[in-house]
Swiss-Prot record:
It comes from Danio rerio (Zebrafish). Coiled coil: none annotated. The lineage of its organism: Eukaryota, Metazoa, Chordata, Craniata, Vertebrata. One of its GO terms (cellular component) is nucleus. One of its GO terms (biological process) is regulation of lipid biosynthetic process. It is found in: Nucleus; Cytoplasm; Cytoplasm, Cytoskeleton. This is Mid1-interacting protein 1A.
Length: 152
């Protein structure tokens, strides 16, 4: 059961993160045997096109199966819930601080605001796509094990 969200909250980053986390948690609870996802193509139509168009394409995209998406989505969920490793953040700060040109405070404030807006829009879009992928993976898993109408 989904609750209707006010229009102002529908596009909020927090709401998008909660939708993503909910979709991944649902996926995690539904997928009881993740190893069944190995070698299952992400999209059946794409798989048919690969087999007919380019005989070597399956080798290049061998890792693009549902299990790799499952692992990736769970990893992203863990990063959102628990944060990324602190040492990676410190390393990035050192790399960016060494290469930044000197700016005035007013320019920095304006740049930071624009930069924040840019990243928030991008993050919202990425979270929406990841939520869709988690829901699709859950539905495909249900189809694969024969419970496609269960739990809706």
């Amino acid at each position: 059961m989904q609750m209707s969200e006010p229009l102002s909250q529908k596009n909020a980053l927090y709401t998008a993160m909660n939708r993503f986390l909910g979709a991944v948690n649902n996926m995690d609870q539904t997928v009881m045997v993740p190893s069944l996802l190995r070698d299952v193509p992400l999209d059946q139509e794409k798989e048919q096109q690969k087999l007919t168009n380019d005989p070597g394409s399956y080798l290049r995209e061998a890792e693009a199966d549902m299990y790799s998406y499952y692992s990736q989505l769970k990893s992203i969920r863990n990063n959102i819930e628990w944060g990324v490793i602190r040492s990676e953040d410190q390393r990035r700060k050192k790399d960016t601080s060494a290469s930044e040109p000197v700016r005035t405070e007013e320019e920095s404030d304006m740049d930071l605001e624009q930069l924040l807006q840019f990243h928030l829009k991008g993050l919202h879009g990425v979270l929406s796509q990841l939520t869709s992928q988690a829901n699709n993976l859950t539905n495909r898993y249900k189809q694969e094990i024969g419970i496609s109408g269960w739990g809706q």
